[in-house]
Each structure stands twice: as structure tokens, then as C-alpha cells.
């Protein structure tokens, strides 16, 4: 799918009822402020909408494409009771793609000051990248260790190109690097370096292990 044009996005956003108690937010695993970002889209303030989304979601262009919205945010949309729910996922995708295409920075969160703490993230799949983004927003010095030569984990190795283009993943990763996230590829934690070495020799205070379950199990 090609996604929304600006006109289509505004029209779709205007369908939102801006519920007083938005169930869509409760259905979102990362608690994106959905009515707020949609209202910004309806006003044509796409950069501000991007800022709202990325205040809680580090991977909007990815989530807008592959999150199961029908069971999460859109599944809770009141509009869906008597018709089609608001296309929340497609609106999120539009906002992220618009931001990437136009290179705007006005709506993006500013790079926070360092809080002086170091955290290692093992694995650059969706869990690892999300963790890295959330920590970077809070001022942590984050380094992601990826065993393979390409960053993204299942996002690049398990999802076909037509569903999630690798260029989209690369742009999301580049934005995380803009916030100070460092990425070490071809580094197998447990072989190349151990968790103990990360903490005792390299000064990391915590390690998040998001290595995934991508390897087959031999019966």
C-alpha cells in the first residue's frame, strides 16, 4: 500500500471523535497519545503530530506498518462499533513518512542531557531498539550490541520487503543514532564479549537482553 496523501490523512483524522476517555490509548502497548496526534494531523500540523507520537514511541514508521492495530488501538476505537475505525496505524505511518521525507526537525524531541548512566542493550530487534530509544530519551548513554552485520533483527530478517521496507528500518535506526544511541554490529554477547565484561570492564550499569528467538531449534 502506498499510504495516505496529506489530504487523505487530514480527512481521515477529522473522523476522530476525540473521546473524553480514549480507549484507543488503552489499546496501545506504548500509550501513544492518539487523539492528540490525530488532532494535530487534522489541523495539518504534521511535525507537531510527529512530536506527540515520538514522545512515547521510538519506532513510528515501523509501528505504523506492522503493528496489529486491528487488535490494539483500532480494535478499541468507538468508530468501529458502527463502521470502520479511524485508521490510526495508517495515520501514524503517514506522519512518520512525512517527517522522514521532508527532513523536518520541529516536532522531534530534542536530544536530552546525559544523566551519566550507561546501559547496554543486547539485540537490535524491535525490543532492543525500543528499549534503546526509551532510555536515550531519558538521558542514558546507550550502546546496542548486534550479533549480525545488519541492524533490525526480525524487522529486517523476518518481515518481507513489501511489508516493511528495509530503508524504513534504516531511517528509524538513524534517528535513534541521532539521539546518541551507539550500535556495535558483529558483536555476539556471550562470545565476543560477556555480560560480566560489559559491566565490570566497560562500565555499563545495566544490561537489557533482547536477543530474540530467531534461531531454529534442532529436534
Give short role names for the model-derived ranges.
Residues 1-23, 48-69, 104-122, 127, ...:
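Ferredoxin-like iron-sulfur electron-transfer modules
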Residues 157-168:
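Glycine-rich phosphate-binding loop and adjoining beta1-alpha1-beta2 segment
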Residues 127, 150, 214:
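Conserved Rossmann-like nucleotide-cofactor binding loop
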Residues 37, 61-65, 69-122, 137-138, ...:
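FAD-binding core/adjacent interface of flavoenzyme oxidoreductases
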Residues 120, 130-134, 142-144:
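Iron-sulfur cluster-binding electron-transfer modules in prokaryotic oxidoreductases
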Residues 132, 136-137, 156:
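Gly/Ala-rich phosphate-binding loop of Rossmann-like dinucleotide-binding domains
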Residues 140-156:
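Glycine-rich FAD pyrophosphate-binding loop
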Residues 10-43, 50, 54-88, 128-130, ...:
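Cysteine-centered iron-sulfur cluster-binding motifs in ferredoxin-type domains/subunits
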Amino acid at each position: 500500500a502506498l499510504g495516505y496523501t496529506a489530504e487523505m490523512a487530514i480527512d481521515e483524522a477529522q473522523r476522530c471523535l476525540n473521546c473524553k476517555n480514549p480507549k484507543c490509548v488503552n489499546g496501545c502497548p506504548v500509550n501513544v497519545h492518539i487523539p492528540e496526534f490525530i488532532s494535530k494531523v487534522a489541523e495539518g500540523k504534521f511535525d507537531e503530530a510527529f512530536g506527540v507520537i515520538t514522545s512515547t514511541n521510538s519506532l513510528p514508521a515501523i509501528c505504523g506498518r506492522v503493528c496489529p492495530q486491528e487488535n490494539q488501538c483500532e480494535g478499541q476505537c468507538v468508530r468501529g462499533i458502527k463502521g470502520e475505525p479511524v485508521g490510526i496505524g495508517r495515520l501514524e505511518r503517514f506522519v512518520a513518512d512525512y517527517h522522514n521525507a521532508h527532513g523536518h526537525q520541529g516536532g522531534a524531541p530534542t536530544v536530552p542531557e546525559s544523566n551519566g548512566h550507561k546501559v547496554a542493550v543486547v539485540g537490535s530487534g524491535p525490543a532492543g531498539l525500543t528499549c534503546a530509544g526509551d532510555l536515550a530519551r531519558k538521558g542514558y548513554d546507550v550502546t546496542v550490541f548486534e550479533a549480525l552485520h545488519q541492524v533490525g533483527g526480525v524487522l529486517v530478517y523476518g518481515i518481507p520487503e513489501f511489508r516493511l521496507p528495509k530503508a524504513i528500518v534504516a531511517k528509524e535506526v538513524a534517528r535513534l543514532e541521532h539521539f546518541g544511541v551507539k550500535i556495535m554490529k558483529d558483536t555476539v554477547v556471550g562470545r565476543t564479549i560477556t555480560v560480566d565484561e560489559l559491566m565490570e570492564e566497560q562500565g555499563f550499569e545495566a544490561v537489557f537482553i533482547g536477543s530474540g528467538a530467531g534461531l531454529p531449534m534442532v529436534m
